[in-house]
Amino acid sequence: FEAALEHGSPRIELDVQMTADGVAVVTHDTSLRRCTGCSANIYDLPYAQVQQLDAGRWFHRQFTGSYIPTLEEVLALCKGKAELNIEIKPSTFTPTLEAETVRLIHAYNYGSDCVVTSQSYETLCKVKELDPDITTGYILALGVGTYYDLPAADFFSVESTFITAGMVQQIHLRGKTISAWTINRQQDAEKLLQLGVDDLITDKPEIIAPLLARDKALDNRLLWLRDQIQELFAAPDAEEAM
């Protein structure tokens, strides 16, 4: 997270799970084996024990000694510096994860600077019950089924290979937006932006961010042009009324 902030990333995606003693932590894997060598799952251990595990050396020796941070630590670090995409990864072993995540979002006044996403629609429903104003996104690995009208999903985050122009159109018709993941090549980003995708999730912000900025700048110019045309055609009507 410190590296992402140093590179000026305006938005950061993270995954949230929970330890045995109810601490919300930021980690992708439920199993601790890949990142730490520990055979336990994250929900099996109290945070004091999880914090002692080296979660950085597997990636690169320069990160030796890095530990799995709490969600609270990440919120404190990123507050005022970056928006967050908080993916909740629920488990039958962690029934209070949604409530704890929302509590921390409120504690750090992060509601307007984050979105909460999940592959579990039930999780999104719980979040909306706790705070209807939090923006929620439904993560879909397959772009099939009738999901466009799900009330607890403000937007959809879809695996990029399943996105079609028709899907984008249906989502936009309902006043919702669509994000694509995970886009690391310029040509893939260009194709998705042409389809009308609203946002891209990437591991390569230095490649993708300029394309998104350019696309949004074009949208702003088109909106300005639309307003100018509307004013032009409205002017004669106003004169006739006089």
Model-derived segments and spans:
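Phosphate-group recognition and catalysis centered on beta-loop-alpha active-site segments
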Residues: 1-242
